[in-house]
């Protein structure tokens, strides 16, 4: 007789564990429990973490037996609580074909184990559906590898330290748990007002792990504009409805001034202190799930991952909605375009509140397992050589920056500060976020060629927040492509006709390359029709990384995604970038922002070109020049105005500078500016990322306040404090009145309820017939609800007339649910309640006298017996009422459904009548003790009939199983339509 072949000889424990997890993962995905998939580990609790009830376990057992070709004892359904328990049971179970099975060698078993492990992780990082998955993947697969080398600016100078992928994830997990303890809900918006620091990375990752949404905003950096800063940031925070603001010590006072201006903001917290509290917090009890992993905090690809507020260079800031799917699509496309990998090294100084810094310089590199050397923007701006020295030190290979950064390096870095510098490792120097100056590209390449920098490494790119980040990227290793076009034809007719070699008046544009993989770009006219090559038009784009719109801003969204650009199902809508461009030889040349272009004498004038010409004048501050147009109604055209900052105060000197600007612009454009206005330094408003606010500059110019001096910082802070105090008092007074009324109502409710329940309970106690007890209770509830001033509206009651036994299935929101249901629907059914409810004073008597069912949630055998009891009642013609969620929480949303009721429907043919409850959660939210007055609505949907199948046993057949899932999904969808809540 051959040796008995068991799984031990066929697979080692690692392979068996991976296979078990694979089977469970497949079942969870089939059940639609996508939120549970990220929680799946060898030690996950099958019921609490993964939501697998008794019937799901029965199905799982059958699948494991098939996968491993063995039989498992029936008791495993009740006794196995984790995948690890199932693995151990499998390793000790005999195979079905033991007589015929051949024992495998240790080598073959090892190969099998490795193959199973490879199969489970073969898709790797590209299987990640959310940023949470990315963080977890890197923590598991690259825990010991350094991800971030952060140089912080502190009071004592610079400090550099590192974070591995594992350390980042661990710190973020603790931060997420602390955020959950502080009441940040899933989907809640948390603002990050932080400088470049360890706290930013940990906090941002922690917010994501908590299932919340980061909202990065820039910290205050100019004391003389603190009032303007407060107005702009409070507008952002109000639009985002943030619940928590994380800041740093030096900005905490300013951050607290914002609180009275933002109604949704509950607290302002020092991020360092929050992280410190998180580190000191006790770990969860053995077997307990961390707070941030409970409820609905797991995210889906379609959930919002980030609100990226545009810097507002042409208008008010708008919150770009970016989902996990949007971000991952862009990050992967960019990585493919620049061939990013773990062998690369990123070097960045970009601000993390800007999309190029947050998404481009960090999250994309996190996805590809790339280490990043990080420094602050201030460190770069004060000493730009530090950026290049970081490339030398870390052997950096990739970086992105706006055009001005490369220009700053050319103008500010002295040879003595970069002796011995080696930039030969730098293979991709991305230049974007603002118009790319071809002269800057050439100057940078020439200036640093002696240090090993190659012109071919330069990559002028195009992107915007509405596309997540990038839209176009040029080919690697080619270098910049500059197109010189005839100025007259381009500015008057919009045709990009190549200029002759000797044309000194030619206008130059830099190619931004071709669309990133899986994305499209088209150039259209005002009617949305595509224009031919070398014809200027409006740049539209589409693809998986394009935003769905602006957060809580429907009007702006309609302009961004016009209704006439909507396409057929399965295709992405075209998005209007707001930029003008032309296409030549398949590459995109961006010419300027639509709102910024000046039309003078029938010619299009591009502000950035005017500003570049004016910057050549001696005495003008570089990067502090704005050109814009003013309507000249008499001439029927626009006047060209140039506003520039200068430190020169003398009238004669200022006049000479203005004359120089006029001459340079006239020579370059062929027409003079109508006005040149010189103003003091610091007058021109800029975005947080250093972009010029042209529209705001224009409005200040028209109001004659552009060069007006700002009040001292202490005056602005005092003013903000005074208005904030008034708002705080007003808000707190109204909140106190509201709270007082709630307390009075709560006390009134308890008095009324006590006076009602004692006689009602006494009478019900002596009624022996459960139907009569139900009718009496429904009548008595009319009195209670009238006294409570809580109206109950019922819709769809006609569906109760459906003949035969029925299963009523409702969402579960609070302990209060049963009362309005008995009032609104009567009690022509038996409730199925958890055992804990039956033990409550008075309530237990009602349940017993009216013949309702109770079950023990913690006992799988009890749940299976309950399913059998349900079927027996239904076959007798009695209807039942179930809460398929099995429990409720304080959090809004429809939780996953247990399958017991749906199995009963399939086995007996009884229809499901979905019942939607709305208002009961607000009346008595879990975790609160005082009810709040509200209206309750009960909506019944048409009955859902099970389709005939072949099974009728406790172990569903394949057709039964799929019918259970269909019934469950149809019921959830019907309930969510009228409940006012979303699916979790």
Describe the role of every protein-language-model region:
Residues 70-90, 102-106, 624, 635-638, ...:
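AMP-binding/adenylate-forming catalytic domain of the ANL superfamily
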Residues 143-146, 283-309, 315-316, 330, ...:
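Conserved pre-ATP/AMP-binding loop-to-beta segment of ANL
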Residues 1, 702, 864-984:
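Non-catalytic C-terminal accessory region of glycerolipid acyltransferases
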Residues 148-202, 222-229, 319-328:
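Conserved AMP-binding/adenylate-forming core of the ANL superfamily
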Residues 328-345, 355-397, 412-416:
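Conserved AMP-binding/adenylation subdomain of ANL enzymes
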Residues 1, 392, 399, 543, ...:
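AMP-binding/adenylate-forming catalytic core of the ANL superfamily
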Residues 488-509, 547-578, 611:
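Conserved ANL (AMP-binding/adenylate-forming) active-site segment centered on the GW(Y/F)…HTG consensus within
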């Amino acid at each position: 007789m051959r040796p008995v072949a068991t799984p031990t000889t066929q697979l080692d424990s690692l392979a068996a564990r991976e296979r078990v997890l694979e089977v469970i993962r497949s079942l969870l995905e089939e059940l639609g429990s996508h939120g549970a998939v990220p929680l799946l580990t060898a030690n996950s609790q099958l019921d609490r973490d993964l939501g697998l009830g008794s019937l799901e376990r029965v199905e799982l057992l059958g699948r494991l037996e098939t996968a491993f070709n063995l039989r498992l004892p029936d008791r495993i359904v009740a006794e196995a609580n984790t995948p690890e328990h199932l693995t151990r049971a499998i390793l000790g179970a005999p195979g079905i074909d033991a007589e015929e099975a051949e024992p495998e060698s240790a080598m073959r078993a090892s190969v099998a184990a490795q193959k199973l492990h490879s199969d489970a992780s073969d898709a790797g990082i590209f299987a990640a559906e959310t940023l949470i998955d990315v963080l977890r993947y890197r923590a598991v697969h690259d825990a010991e590898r350094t991800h971030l080398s952060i140089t912080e600016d502190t009071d004592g100078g610079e400090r550099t330290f590192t974070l591995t992928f594992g350390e980042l994830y661990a710190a973020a997990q603790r931060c997420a748990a602390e955020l959950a303890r502080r009441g940040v809900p899933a989907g809640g918006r948390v603002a990050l007002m932080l400088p470049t620091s360890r706290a930013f990375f940990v906090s941002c990752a922690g917010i994501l792990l908590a299932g919340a949404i980061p909202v990065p905003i820039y910290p205050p950096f100019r004391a003389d504009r603190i009032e303007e800063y407060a107005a702009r940031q409070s507008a952002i925070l109000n639009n985002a409805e943030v619940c928590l603001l994380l800041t740093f010590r030096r900005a905490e006072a300013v951050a607290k001034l914002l609180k009275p201006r933002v109604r949704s903001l509950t607290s302002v917290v020092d991020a360092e202190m929050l992280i410190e509290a998180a580190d000191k917090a006790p770990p969860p009890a053995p077997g307990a799930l961390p707070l941030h992993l409970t409820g609905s905090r797991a995210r889906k690809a379609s959930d919002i991952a980030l609100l990226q507020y545009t810097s507002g260079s042409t208008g008010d800031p708008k919150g770009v909605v970016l989902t996990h799917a949007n971000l991952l699509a862009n990050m992967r496309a960019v990585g493919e375009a620049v061939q990013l990998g773990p062998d690369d090294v990123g070097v960045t100084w970009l601000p993390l509140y800007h999309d190029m810094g947050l998404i481009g310089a960090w999250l994309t590199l996190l996805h590809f397992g790339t280490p990043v050397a990080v420094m602050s923007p201030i460190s770069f701006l004060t000493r730009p050589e530090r950026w290049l020295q970081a490339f030398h030190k870390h052997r950096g290979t990739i970086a992105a920056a706006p055009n001005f950064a490369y220009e700053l390096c050319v103008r500010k870095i002295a040879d003595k500060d970069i002796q011995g510098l080696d930039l030969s490792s730098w293979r991709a120097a991305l230049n974007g976020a603002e118009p790319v100056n071809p002269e800057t590209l050439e100057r940078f390449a020439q200036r640093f060629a002696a240090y090993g920098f190659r012109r071919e490494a330069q990559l002028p790119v195009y992107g915007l927040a509405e596309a997540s980040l990038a839209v176009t990227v040029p080919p690697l290793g080619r270098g910049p492509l500059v197109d010189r076009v005839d100025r007259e034809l381009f500015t008057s007719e919009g045709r990009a006709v190549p200029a002759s070699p000797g044309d000194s008046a030619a206008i130059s544009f830099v190619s931004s390359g071709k669309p990133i993989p899986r994305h499209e770009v088209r150039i259209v006219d005002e009617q949305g029709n595509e224009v031919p090559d070398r014809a200027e038009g409006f740049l539209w784009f589409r693809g998986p990384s394009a935003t769905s719109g602006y957060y809580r801003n429907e009007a702006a969204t309609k302009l961004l995604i016009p209704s006439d650009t909507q396409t057929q199902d399965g295709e992405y809508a075209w998005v209007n970038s707001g930029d003008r461009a032309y296409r030549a030889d398949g590459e995109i040349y961006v010419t300027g922002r639509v709102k910024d272009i000046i039309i003078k004498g029938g010619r299009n004038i591009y502000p950035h070109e005017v500003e570049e010409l004016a910057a050549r004048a001696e005495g003008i501050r570089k990067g502090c020049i704005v050109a814009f147009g003013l309507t000249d109604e008499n001439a029927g055209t626009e006047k060209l105005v140039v506003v520039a900052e200068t430190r020169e105060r003398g009238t004669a000197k200022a006049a000479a500078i203005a004359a120089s600007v006029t001459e340079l612009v006239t020579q370059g454009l062929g027409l003079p500016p109508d006005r040149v206005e010189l103003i003091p330094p610091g007058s021109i408003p800029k975005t947080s990322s250093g972009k010029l606010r042209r529209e705001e500059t224009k409005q200040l110019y028209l109001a004659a306040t552009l060069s007006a001096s700002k009040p001292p910082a202490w005056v602005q802070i005092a003013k903000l404090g005074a208005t904030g105090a008034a708002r705080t008092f007003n808000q707190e007074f109204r909140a106190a009145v509201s709270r007082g009324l709630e307390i009075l109502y709560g006390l009134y409710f308890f008095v009324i309820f006590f006076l009602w329940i004692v006689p009602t309970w006494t009478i019900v106690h002596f009624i022996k017939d459960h139907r009569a007890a139900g009718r009496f209770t429904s009548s008595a509830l009319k009195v209670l609800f009238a006294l409570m001033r809580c109206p109950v509206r019922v819709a769809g009651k006609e569906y109760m007339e459906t003949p035969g036994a029925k299963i009523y299935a409702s969402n579960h929101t609070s302990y209060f649910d049963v009362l309005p249901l008995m009032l609104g629907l009567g009690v022509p059914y038996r409730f199925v309640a958890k055992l804990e409810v039956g033990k409550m004073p008075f309530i237990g008597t009602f349940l017993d006298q009216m013949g309702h069912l109770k079950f023990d949630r913690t006992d799988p055998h009890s749940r299976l017996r309950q399913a059998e009891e349900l079927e027996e009642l239904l076959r007798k013609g009695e209807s039942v009422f179930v809460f398929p969620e099995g429990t409720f929480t304080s959090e809004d949303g429809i939780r996953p459904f247990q399958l017991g009721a749906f199995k009963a429907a399939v086995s007996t043919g009884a229809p499901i009548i979905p019942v939607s409850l709305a208002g009961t959660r607000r009346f008595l939210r879990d975790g609160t003790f005082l009810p709040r007055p509200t209206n309750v609505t009960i909506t019944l949907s048409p009955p859902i009939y099970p389709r005939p199948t072949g099974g009728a046993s406790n172990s569903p057949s394949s057709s039964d199983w799929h019918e259970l899932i269909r019934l469950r999904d149809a019921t959830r969808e019907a309930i969510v339509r009228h409940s006012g809540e979303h699916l979790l």
